[in-house]
Amino acid sequence: MYKRQAMGYQKLGVAFCGGLKEEGRIACEIFRAHGFTVVSAICKAGGVPKEQVGLGEEDKVHPGQFEPMCNPIAQAMLLNEQQTEFNIVIGLCVGHDSLFYKYAQAPTTTLVTKDRALAHNPAGALYCAHSYFKDKV
């Protein structure tokens, strides 16, 4: 945060996964409390139905209900339209994060890497490589 202030950035973009919306909300609050203007975009931006890309009801988390697919390119485009100066990713899926980086015009960093098995702390597996995970890796 202090590095971004030192670099003169005022307008931050936050691209986050819907599964980490609370974490995204808290991060945005913290950035605003430190004087940044914050624009955010959730992963389901654009509301494109999964059926539009050929997925069926059996592919949905909640069959029978409207379920938009993740759209990291739309997230990037929304933040581009808002002319963010620096973007922060919170929990985008592997692959989705790469698409976001590709299409975002502002420099981007990742604050939280999605890893539900390790409470979004993938380094935890490395810390435990010689103990708990020794026989699992």
Where are the language model's segments positioned?
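Conserved acidic residues
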Residues: 10, 85-86
